């Protein structure tokens, strides 16, 4: 089980949709969302929780509601008992979740609008940034972790204007798009 899920969080800017998904993410995710000032940041946070819920149920067969989630001393979220590993990230209009049977880190970054001469160089910088962020999430030591690490790096650049990088000792092959079902 090595999957990466991505969701567009813009539907969460609608209050009814936001409330629906807010009620379905864990208490820790709700508290995090409540601490944020802007609606878009709250939508990103709840979007990360929503894509985690879907990934858990789709990839593992576990019921999201049957699991307890925690945050370790480095701020890395985990499922109690480690039945699987996951990593979350969000940027711009998207939230992503990588889920695996081994430790994993993921990062997504939105490419900024740049003039043509700068775009190629900056895209490389963004790619390196996402690799470093994903590695830091994998190890739980953060962005400034300078330790050497052998891992597969899966980078996806087909999501318009975004780069997604996964770091793991397992191979990831594709990015799975998940669309938030609208509440009835």
PLM features: what roles do these ranges have?
Residues 1-184:
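Core catalytic alpha/beta fold that binds nucleotide/phospho-ligands
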């Amino acid at each position: 089980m090595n999957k990466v899920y991505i969701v567009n969080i813009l539907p969460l800017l609608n209050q009814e949709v936001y409330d629906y998904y807010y009620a379905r993410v864990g208490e820790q995710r709700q508290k995090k969302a409540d601490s944020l000032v802007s609606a878009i940041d709250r939508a990103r946070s709840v979007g990360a929780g929503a894509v985690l819920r879907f990934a858990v149920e789709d990839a593992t067969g576990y019921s999201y509601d049957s699991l307890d989630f925690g945050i370790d001393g480095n701020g890395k979220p985990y499922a109690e008992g480690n039945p699987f590993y996951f990593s979350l990230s969000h940027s711009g209009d998207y939230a992503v979740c990588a889920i695996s049977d081994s430790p994993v880190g993921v990062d997504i970054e939105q490419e900024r609008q740049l003039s043509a001469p700068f775009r190629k160089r900056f895209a490389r910088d963004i790619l390196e940034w996402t690799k470093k962020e994903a590695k830091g999430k994998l190890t739980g030591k953060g962005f400034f972790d300078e330790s050497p690490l052998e891992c597969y790096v899966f980078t996806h650049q087909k999501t318009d204007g975004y780069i997604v990088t996964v770091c793991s000792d397992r191979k990831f092959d594709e990015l799975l798009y998940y669309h938030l079902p609208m509440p009835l």
